[in-house]
From Swiss-Prot:
Plays a role in cell envelope biogenesis, maintenance of cell envelope integrity and membrane homeostasis. The chain crosses the membrane at residues 22-42, 50-70, 76-96, 121-141, 151-171. One of its GO terms (cellular component) is plasma membrane. It is a multi-pass membrane protein. Its main location: membrane. This is Inner membrane-spanning protein YciB. Disulfide bonds: none annotated. It comes from Buchnera aphidicola subsp. Schizaphis graminum (strain Sg). Belongs to the YciB family. The keyword Protease does not apply.
Length: 177
């Protein structure tokens, strides 16, 4: 159920963009993101920090897109989110005792600290790469291509990175046994 709730805003944005325009799609994105947070609260009695952060950035950048009738605001949203994630991961990599990914997952996944650092660094680079790639696509290519890239391209890259990380973790867990 959580996966469906997480995908609902992006696919709603895509559908409304296809039938209308980026401004109607931005309105729908704000509404569905807020509704998703409300459903999280009703079903799970909590809203996780990432979903709340996502809703706040969607509300801010979506509203700016609508108010100023300028699609650049919504296009920059994912770049800023991914850049923030990258910075947080890099900071945890170099200035904290444990990388942030390790803090979230070490209860369920038992691998050495060295491997956690590699995974954390991989994800920091991944988010940096995606934020730069989004800037390029948003600024240099037509809006329709950016929407497809945001919905399908970034989703595919995320899926691929999760798959690579999962394979790496499984390999390292087997190696350490």
């Amino acid at each position: 159920m959580k996966k469906i709730l997480n995908l609902l805003p992006i696919f709603t944005f895509f559908i409304f963009y296809r039938f209308y325009d980026i401004f109607i799609a931005s309105k729908s994105l704000i509404f569905i993101s807020g509704l998703t947070c409300l459903l999280y609260w009703i079903i799970y009695k909590e809203i996780d920090k990432i979903n709340l952060f996502s809703f706040i950035t969607i509300a801010i950048f979506g509203s700016l897109t609508i108010i100023f009738h300028n699609s650049q605001f919504i296009k920059w949203k994912i770049t800023i989110i991914y850049m923030i994630f990258s910075v947080i991961l890099f900071i945890s990599q170099f200035f904290m005792k444990k990388p942030i990914i390790q803090r979230f997952l070490e209860k369920d996944i038992k691998i050495s600290d060295l491997y956690w650092k590699k995974i954390n660094f991989f994800w920091a680079l991944f988010f940096l790469f995606c934020s730069i790639l989004n800037i390029y696509v948003a600024l240099c290519l037509p809006e329709k291509i950016w929407v497809n890239f945001k919905v399908f391209g970034l989703s595919f890259l995320m899926f691929l990175s999760i798959l690579i990380t999962s394979i790496y973790i499984n390999f390292k867990m087997l190696k350490e046994k």
